[in-house]
């Protein structure tokens, strides 16, 4: 599913607003021990973002690349911008940036993902974050995860993923190392138990 076709269809039992948690036997190395926040899931496919994968890029690098600041400005960036989290959102369009954020910031280009979370992919929100006018909670992701029609359903049927309702706190927590274990805990599963079950599958 392309980002431009992002829509929601919760009434038909799709998984938008849920986490996908990779099983230990996940065949695609892009998703090993990943937690994916599903933003849209319809008969046309699905798209979402990995929320526990680091990206060796700083927010200042993004601003410089977009010509929003110069080197002198980069040195003077306030702490909130200097420390703003950048993550790897997935293997599709890795050069493109997306901001998941709380709904206290909305622009004409913002797309509601849930009652409390929106998605914006324009320069306006990048400028707002750098100026201290951005949302209270946000993270920038480079790239996204996408599935074609029926692809995600097939992966779930083949035991590639577990799923559960998403946690806003987990999405925006800047500590990434334990997100996989914490996502499993949402459904009462320990990593050790999951690994043992997978080994006997």
UniProtKB/Swiss-Prot annotation:
The record, for InterPro entries, names:
AlgH-like
Q: Which Pfam family, any one of them, does this sequence belong to?
A: DUF179
**SUPFAM superfamilies cross-referenced by the UniProt entry:** VC0467-like
Record's Gene Ontology CC terms?
Answer: cytosol
Family named by the database record: Belongs to the UPF0301 (AlgH) family.
Return the HAMAP family for the record: UPF0301
Q: How is this protein named in the record?
A: UPF0301 protein Avi_1069
**Organism annotation:** Allorhizobium ampelinum (strain ATCC BAA-846 / DSM 112012 / S4) (Agrobacterium vitis (strain S4))
């Amino acid at each position: 599913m392309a980002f431009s076709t992002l829509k929601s269809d919760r009434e038909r039992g799709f998984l938008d607003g849920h986490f996908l948690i990779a099983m230990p036997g996940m065949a695609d190395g892009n998703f090993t021990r990943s937690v994916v926040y599903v933003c849209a899931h319809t008969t046309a496919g699905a798209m979402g973002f990995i929320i526990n994968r680091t990206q060796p890029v700083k927010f200042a690098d993004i601003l410089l690349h977009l010509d929003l600041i110069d080197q002198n400005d980069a040195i003077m960036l306030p702490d909130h911008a200097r420390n703003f989290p950048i993550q790897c959102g997935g293997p599709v369009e890795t050069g493109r940036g997306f901001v998941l954020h709380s709904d206290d910031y909305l622009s004409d280009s913002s797309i509601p993902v849930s009652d409390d979370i929106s998605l914006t992919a324009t320069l306006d929100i990048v400028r707002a974050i750098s100026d201290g006018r951005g949302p209270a909670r946000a993270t920038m992701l480079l790239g996204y995860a996408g599935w074609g029609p029926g692809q995600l359903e097939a992966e779930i049927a083949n035991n590639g993923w577990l799923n559960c309702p998403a946690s806003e706190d987990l999405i925006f927590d800047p500590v990434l190392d334990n997100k996989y274990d914490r996502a499993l805990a949402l459904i009462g599963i320990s990593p050790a138990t999951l690994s043992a079950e997978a080994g006997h599958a």
